[in-house]
Amino acid sequence: MKINTGDILYEHFSRNTGEVISVIEHPDGKIIKVRWRLDGQLPHDTELFYKKVKRCIRDGLYEHTPAN
C-alpha cells in the first residue's frame, strides 16, 4: 500500500476526515501533509511522518481510501 496525494484518511477517535495534500522527501524520511476537516470547523493542516501514518493505518487508527 502506498500513500499518494489526493488519498483520504479517516480517524475514528476524533471523526476527522483528512486529504493528503502532498508527500515531501526529507532527509529524515518522507513527510505527508494532511488537511483535516471537521464538520462545522475550519480545516487545519498537519505534517506527519510517512512511517507513522502507515503504522496508524496498519493498526486500524486511520482508514485509508486511495484517490483512484
Where are the regions that the model predicts?
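Short coil-to-beta transition motif at edge beta-strands of beta-rich domains
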Residues: 1-14
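Short beta-strand-centered aromatic/proline hotspots
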Residues: 16-25
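SH3/SH3-like beta-barrel fold
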Residues: 32-36
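Intrinsically disordered, low-complexity, charged/polar segments
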Residues: 39-68
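Short acidic/glycine-enriched loop/turn segments that link adjacent beta-strands
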Residues: 27-30
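Glycine-centered tight beta-turn/hairpin loop motif at sheet-sheet or coil-to-beta transitions
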Residues: 13-16, 39-41
